[in-house]
C-alpha cells in the first residue's frame, strides 16, 4: 500500500508579531495575558515539526495544532502586508522549499501532514485479519477526506499553489489513491467473509478503475515529472491485477448459469491482464504484492485451461469476442470520511473585536426574539386547546363514564392521601406564620434601635443646646430609614398574601379533606348508564383527545430543541471571518431554525382540525348523556378543582417560605447595620457629654477626640459614623455628604398582594417609628416585590 511523504518545515517564532498585534489592536494587558498561550503555540509547532513516529498520538498532536491555527486564521491577519510571519515548507514530492507570509499556507501544509500521517498509519496496518483490514480501510477513507478538504481549502487560497503538491491534479490524485486502497481493503474483507463471486467481481472492478484514474492523474503535465516513478508502476500493476480478479470472479459465476462460452472468453482476458500485471512488477516491489500476483497467475491460468477444455470437449458453447462482452458492473463502497470535529480550548477566544461582539449580540437578539415568539405561539395554542376542551366539558365528561372512581381521580387522591393533604397545608401555613413573625420582629428591632438613638440625640440637644454640636440623627439615617420603610412595606404585602392563602385554604379545606377518603367519594358518585350504541362515539372522542395530547407533547419536545439550539448557537467565529458579508451570515445562520418552525406551524394547523373534529364528536356524545352522568361529571369536576387548588397552595407556600428565609438574611444584615450605627453614635454621645461636663471646648483645635470617637463603624461597608466634635461646621457639612449608606434590596420575588387587610392574628403591618421621616426611594431604585401568592398556572 502507498503512503504519502510529509512536508518539511523550519522553526517559526510567533511571539513578537502576535504580541505586537495584540498590544496594538487590544491592549498591553491582553498581550501580557496571552504570553503563555503564544509560548505554548511555539512549543506545539516545534513538536509537530520534529515528529518522527507514525502513531495515533502523533496524529492527534498535528490535529491539535491545525485546530489552533483555525483560531489564528480568524483573529490575526497574518500576511505580507500585515502581521508578518513567514512559513517555510517543502513540497512532498521533491522537497523544494516555498516560503509565504500566509496563515492559509501554514494551515494547508499542516493539514497535508495530517493526511500524510493518516495514510502512513493505514499503509503500515497489518491486514492479515478482519480487524486490521477494517482499521486500514477506515484510515484510508479518512485520508481521502483530508486531501479532499485540502483541495477545497487550497482552491479558496490560490497562493497555496506555489507548492507543487497543492495543485488541483496533485490533491485529486491523493484523494483517488486513498479511495483505491480503501476499496481494496473492502474487497479483502469481502473475500475473508466469503461473499458471493458476483459481489467480489464488482468490488474488484471498482478497485481497478480507481487505479486507472490514479495513473492518468500521475501522467498529467503537472505531475509526471515530479512524482515517484514507483507510484506509476504500482498503479499499473494493481490495475491489471484487479481487472484480472474481477474477470476471474465473474467467470466463476458464469459457470453456475451454464454460460460456458462467455466464461472462457472472460478468463482468456483475465489471463492477459494478470500476465501484464506480472510483467510490470518492479524488482523493488513489495514481496506481499509479488506473492499475490503470482498466486493469481497460477489460479487464473489453471481455471482458464480447465474451462477451455470442458467447453471444447463437452459444452461446445460459442466463445464471444472481447468487444461483445458487457462491462462488469462496478460497486464503489469506499468514500471520503469527514474530518474530526475541531474540539479544543481556544487559547485566543477572548480576542474578539468590539465590532464583532456587537454583531454577535445583534444576531443573539434575533434568535432570542425568534425563540420567544415560537414559545409564545406554543403556549397560546396549548392554552387555546385546553380552553376549547374545557368549554366542551372535556375530559371530565368522559371520565364521568367510568365505573367507580376514574383512574385520573384515583391518582390525584393517592397524591393528597400520601402527603396528608390538609395536615400538610396546615403545617406549611404554621411554618410561614412563624417565619413572618420572625422577620417582623427583626425589622421592628432595627426600627426601635434607630428610634431610640434619635430620641436620645434629641434629648441631649434639648439639654445642652448649642454645646451639643454634632450632626442630627435624621441626617445620618436617611438611607437606613428609607430601607426600614421599604422592608416594612414588603412585610405588609407579604402578610396580605399570607392572608389570601389562608382564606383560599379555608374555602377549599373540606374538598381537599374529602380527597383523602376514597370510600366517601365512591358513595357520592352516581352511576352513569350510556346506551351501548354510543360506545363508538366515546371511543372516537377518546382517540381524538389522545391525538391532541400527543400533539401538545410533541410541541413541548420541539420547544426544548429550540431552546437547546438557541443556547448552543454562537456565530462569533463565523463573524470573525473576513471572507463573508455579515448580513449573509445572519441570513444563513437563522435558517437553521426553519425546520423546527415549520414543524410547529404544521402542528398548529393540525390542532385546528383536531379541535373541530372533537367538537363534532362531542356534540354527538353530549346528546346521549344521562342525568346521572351530568351529576357525576359535576362531582368529578369539583374534586379535580380541589386537587388543582391543593397544588396551587403547596406552590404558593413553598415560594412564600423561600421568600421569608431569604428576606430574613437581608433583615439580619440590616439589623447589624443599625446596631453598628447606634453603637458608634452611643460612644460619641458619651464622649461629647464627658467633654461638656468637664468644661472642655469641643471646638478647640487642641482637643483630640478619644479613641472611642474615631468613627466606630468605619470598618463596616456603609460607614454610618458621624463627624468628629472638633471639626468646623463647614467640615461637618462636607463629611455629612459622605454618609450615604448603600441600600440592599430584598430578594427578587414576584408578588401581587390581595386588596384586603390581614387579620389580627397575622400581627398586622409594622408601622415605622413615628419620628422618622423616611424619604421616598431614589428614582433609580425599583424595589422588587415579594412572592406572588397566586401566580401559578395549572
Swiss-Prot record:
<feature type="compositionally biased region" description="Polar residues">
    <location>
        <begin position="713"/>
        <end position="722"/>
    </location>
</feature>
<dbReference type="GO" id="GO:0030659">
    <property type="term" value="C:cytoplasmic vesicle membrane"/>
</dbReference>
<keyword id="KW-0175">Coiled coil</keyword>
<feature type="compositionally biased region" description="Low complexity">
    <location>
        <begin position="723"/>
        <end position="742"/>
    </location>
</feature>
<dbReference type="InterPro" id="IPR038499">
    <property type="entry name" value="BRO1_sf"/>
</dbReference>
<feature type="coiled-coil region">
    <location>
        <begin position="600"/>
        <end position="655"/>
    </location>
</feature>
<feature type="coiled-coil region">
    <location>
        <begin position="499"/>
        <end position="568"/>
    </location>
</feature>
<dbReference type="GO" id="GO:0019722">
    <property type="term" value="P:calcium-mediated signaling"/>
</dbReference>
<feature type="compositionally biased region" description="Pro residues">
    <location>
        <begin position="765"/>
        <end position="787"/>
    </location>
</feature>
<keyword id="KW-0963">Cytoplasm</keyword>
<dbReference type="GO" id="GO:0045881">
    <property type="term" value="P:positive regulation of sporulation resulting in formation of a cellular spore"/>
</dbReference>
<protein>
    <recommendedName>
        <fullName>ALG-2 interacting protein X</fullName>
    </recommendedName>
</protein>
<dbReference type="InterPro" id="IPR004328">
    <property type="entry name" value="BRO1_dom"/>
</dbReference>
<keyword id="KW-0472">Membrane</keyword>
<dbReference type="GO" id="GO:0031286">
    <property type="term" value="P:negative regulation of sorocarp stalk cell differentiation"/>
</dbReference>
<feature type="compositionally biased region" description="Low complexity">
    <location>
        <begin position="698"/>
        <end position="712"/>
    </location>
</feature>
<dbReference type="GO" id="GO:0043328">
    <property type="term" value="P:protein transport to vacuole involved in ubiquitin-dependent protein catabolic process via the multivesicular body sorting pathway"/>
</dbReference>
<feature type="compositionally biased region" description="Low complexity">
    <location>
        <begin position="749"/>
        <end position="764"/>
    </location>
</feature>
<keyword id="KW-0968">Cytoplasmic vesicle</keyword>
<keyword id="KW-0967">Endosome</keyword>
<feature type="domain" description="BRO1">
    <location>
        <begin position="1"/>
        <end position="385"/>
    </location>
</feature>
<feature type="region of interest" description="Disordered">
    <location>
        <begin position="695"/>
        <end position="794"/>
    </location>
</feature>
<dbReference type="GO" id="GO:0005737">
    <property type="term" value="C:cytoplasm"/>
</dbReference>
<dbReference type="Pfam" id="PF03097">
    <property type="entry name" value="BRO1"/>
</dbReference>
<dbReference type="Pfam" id="PF13949">
    <property type="entry name" value="ALIX_LYPXL_bnd"/>
</dbReference>
<dbReference type="GO" id="GO:0005768">
    <property type="term" value="C:endosome"/>
</dbReference>
<comment type="function">
    <text>Unknown. Required for development but not for cell death.</text>
</comment>
<dbReference type="GO" id="GO:0009653">
    <property type="term" value="P:anatomical structure morphogenesis"/>
</dbReference>
<dbReference type="InterPro" id="IPR025304">
    <property type="entry name" value="ALIX_V_dom"/>
</dbReference>
<comment type="subunit">
    <text>Self-associates; the interaction is calcium-independent Interacts with pefa; the interaction is calcium-dependent. Interacts with pefb; the interaction is calcium-dependent.</text>
</comment>
Amino acid at each position: 500500500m502507498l503512503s504519502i511523504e510529509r512536508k518539511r518545515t523550519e522553526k517559526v517564532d510567533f511571539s513578537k508579531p502576535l504580541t505586537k498585534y495584540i498590544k496594538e489592536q487590544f491592549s498591553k494587558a491582553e498581550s501580557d495575558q496571552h504570553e503563555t498561550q503564544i509560548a505554548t503555540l511555539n512549543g506545539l509547532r516545534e513538536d509537530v515539526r520534529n515528529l518522527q513516529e507514525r502513531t495515533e498520538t502523533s496524529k492527534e498532536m498535528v490535529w491539535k495544532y491545525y485546530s489552533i491555527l483555525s483560531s489564528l486564521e480568524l483573529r490575526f491577519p497574518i500576511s505580507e502586508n500585515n502581521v508578518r510571519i513567514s512559513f517555510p515548507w517543502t513540497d512532498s514530492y521533491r522537497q523544494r522549499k516555498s516560503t509565504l507570509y500566509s496563515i492559509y499556507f501554514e494551515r494547508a501544509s499542516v493539514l497535508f501532514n495530517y493526511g500524510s500521517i493518516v495514510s502512513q498509519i493505514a499503509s503500515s496496518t497489518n491486514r492479515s485479519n478482519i480487524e486490521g483490514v477494517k482499521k486500514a480501510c477506515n484510515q484510508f477513507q479518512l485520508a481521502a477526506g483530508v486531501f479532499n478538504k485540502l483541495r477545497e481549502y487550497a482552491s479558496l487560497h490560490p497562493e497555496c499553489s506555489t507548492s507543487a503538491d497543492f495543485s488541483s491534479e496533485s490533491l485529486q490524485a491523493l484523494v483517488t489513491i486513498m479511495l483505491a486502497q480503501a476499496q481494496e481493503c473492502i474487497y479483502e474483507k469481502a473475500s475473508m467473509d466469503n461473499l458471493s463471486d458476483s459481489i467480489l467481481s464488482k468490488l474488484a472492478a471498482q478497485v481497478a478503475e480507481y487505479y486507472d484514474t490514479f495513473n492518468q492523474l500521475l501522467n498529467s503535465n503537472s505531475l509526471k515529472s515530479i512524482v515517484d516513478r514507483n507510484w506509476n508502476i504500482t498503479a499499473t500493476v494493481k490495475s491489471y491485477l484487479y481487472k484480472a480478479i474481477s474477470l476471474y470472479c465473474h467467470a466463476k459465476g458464469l459457470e453456475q448459469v451454464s454460460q460456458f462460452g462467455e466464461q472462457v472468453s472472460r478468463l482468456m482476458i483475465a489471463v492477459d491482464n494478470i500476465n501484464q500485471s506480472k510483467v510490470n512488477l518492479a524488482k523493488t516491489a513489495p514481496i506481499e504484492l509479488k506473492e499475490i500476483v503470482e498466486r493469481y497467475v497460477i489460479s487464473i491460468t489453471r481455471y482458464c485451461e480447465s474451462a477451455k477444455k470442458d467447453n471444447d470437449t463437452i459444452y461446445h458453447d460459442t466463445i464471444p469476442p472481447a468487444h461483445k462482452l458487457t462491462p462488469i458492473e462496478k460497486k464503489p463502497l469506499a468514500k471520503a470520511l469527514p474530518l474530526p470535529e475541531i474540539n479544543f480550548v481556544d487559547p485566543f477566544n477572548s480576542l474578539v473585536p468590539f465590532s464583532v461582539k456587537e454583531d454577535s449580540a445583534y444576531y443573539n437578539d434575533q434568535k432570542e426574539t425568534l425563540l420567544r415568539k415560537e414559545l409564545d405561539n406554543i403556549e397560546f395554542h396549548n392554552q387555546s386547546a385546553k380552553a376549547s376542551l374545557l368549554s366542551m366539558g372535556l375530559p371530565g365528561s368522559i371520565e364521568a363514564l367510568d365505573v367507580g372512581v376514574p383512574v385520573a381521580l384515583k391518582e390525584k387522591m393517592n397524591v393528597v392521601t400520601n402527603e396528608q393533604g390538609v395536615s400538610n397545608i396546615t403545617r406549611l401555613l404554621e411554618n410561614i406564620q412563624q417565619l413572618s413573625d420572625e422577620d417582623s420582629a427583626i425589622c421592628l428591632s432595627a426600627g426601635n434601635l434607630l428610634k431610640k438613638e434619635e430620641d436620645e440625640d434629641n434629648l441631649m440637644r434639648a439639654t445642652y443646646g448649642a454645646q451639643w454640636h454634632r450632626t442630627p440623627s435624621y441626617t445620618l439615617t436617611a438611607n437606613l430609614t428609607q430601607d426600614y420603610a421599604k422592608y416594612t412595606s414588603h412585610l405588609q404585602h407579604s402578610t396580605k398574601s399570607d392572608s389570601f392563602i389562608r382564606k383560599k385554604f379555608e374555602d377549599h379545606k373540606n374538598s381537599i379533606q374529602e380527597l383523602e377518603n376514597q370510600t366517601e367519594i365512591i358513595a357520592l358518585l352516581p352511576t352513569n348508564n350510556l346506551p351501548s350504541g354510543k360506545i363508538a362515539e366515546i371511543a372516537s372522542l377518546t382517540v381524538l383527545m389522545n391525538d391532541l395530547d400527543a400533539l401538545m407533547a410533541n410541541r413541548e419536545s420541539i420547544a426544548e430543541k429550540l431552546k437547546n439550539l438557541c443556547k448552543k448557537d454562537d456565530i462569533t467565529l463565523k463573524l470573525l471571518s473576513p471572507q463573508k458579508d455579515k448580513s449573509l451570515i445572519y441570513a444563513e445562520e437563522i435558517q437553521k431554525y426553519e425546520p423546527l418552525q415549520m414543524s410547529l406551524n404544521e402542528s398548529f394547523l393540525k390542532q385546528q382540525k383536531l379541535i373541530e373534529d372533537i367538537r363534532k364528536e362531542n356534540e354527538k356524545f353530549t346528546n346521549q348523556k344521562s342525568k346521572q352522568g351530568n351529576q357525576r361529571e359535576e362531582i368529578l369536576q369539583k374534586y379535580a378543582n380541589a386537587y388543582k387548588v391543593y397544588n396551587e397552595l403547596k406552590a404558593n407556600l413553598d415560594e412564600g417560605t423561600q421568600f421569608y428565609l431569604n428576606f430574613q438574611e437581608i433583615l439580619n444584615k440590616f439589623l447589624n447595620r443599625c446596631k453598628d450605627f447606634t453603637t458608634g453614635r452611643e460612644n460619641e454621645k458619651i464622649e461629647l457629654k464627658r467633654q461638656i461636663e468637664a468644661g472642655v471646648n469641643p471646638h478647640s483645635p487642641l482637643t483630640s477626640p478619644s479613641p472611642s470617637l474615631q468613627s466606630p463603624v468605619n470598618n463596616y461597608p456603609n460607614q454610618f459614623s458621624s463627624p468628629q466634635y472638633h471639626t468646623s461646621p463647614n467640615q461637618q457639612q462636607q463629611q455629612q455628604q459622605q454618609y450615604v449608606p448603600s441600600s440592599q434590596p430584598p430578594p427578587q420575588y414576584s408578588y401581587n398582594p390581595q386588596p384586603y387587610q390581614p387579620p389580627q392574628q397575622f400581627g398586622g403591618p409594622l408601622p415605622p417609628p413615628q419620628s422618622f421621616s423616611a424619604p421616598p426611594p431614589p428614582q433609580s431604585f425599583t424595589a422588587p416585590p415579594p412572592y406572588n401568592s397566586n401566580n401559578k398556572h395549572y
